């Protein structure tokens, strides 16, 4: 069973798994490839397309460029490709691991899914990892990028591929952030500020793509200020509304600062207060749905906030999450990214 939440190619996306008779490839996709139409135009000189959807672009791109096709995709995704002719399977996870992808082997079979509970439903035994839990309870560590809190269940790390031929599993790294930044720095260090802003413009533009109604999530920080500034340059959608959640007292949150940032825009802002009772209720939801420990109060707060937004008919929120850390503005315990920045 496969279910993908789509925000673009809503009307043209074919059912999954998608079979491409021309290439002998079968694909399943979770996520979005924002530049799939650009990739399609590069391929039209070599292939005839039978659909307008994203999945056929993946099969044709993989047939043309092999593992190198993923470096051409801009977005967040987990992709599974099966070659009917060679009987080989490929699993791919996006550059930063936005979309999850888990796998396990049992009785000579390979199981994979975007949720651990789906592996259990498929017959994988649900046995807790004593070593992983002991390390978490003693040191609050989540283990290596390969590990989960369950015996025999692995996650494919961000920026990795997994090849399976029926006998052996071979992992391969297809994207390395540190290496990519180093190459930029060595080739044209004077262009780094310009290149960074180009990437930001493209990312903000991608976040506004699609037919679904969207909202803007603010948090009163540097990332929100930069996001709003870039959106003003690109052009604010008329229907866009902004939202900000807060806990505790209003004047101690970033709401007032966010309102000041929006003063020169036509964007209305709605304040959403997250109460103690909402957090306790959300914690109960998370305990039922999460197969691994959450990372703290912020996760519970965001989950409660997203639930409020969903009840109001919004399924997509745009924002600058993580940009503070990328710019070195916030230090997290055990975070090694500051030295890199």
Model-predicted regions and their roles:
Residues 1-284, 288, 302:
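Cysteine-centered catalytic environments shared across enzyme families
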Residues 37, 103, 227, 297, ...:
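Residues at secondary-structure transition points
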Residues 140, 292-298:
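Short, flexible loop segments at the rims of nucleotide/cofactor-binding pockets, characterized by
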Residues 267, 292, 314:
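Short glycine/serine/threonine/alanine-rich loop segments
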Residues 298-304:
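Adenylate-forming
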Residues 304-341:
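Active-site adenylate/phosphate-handling loop in enzymes that bind or generate adenylated species
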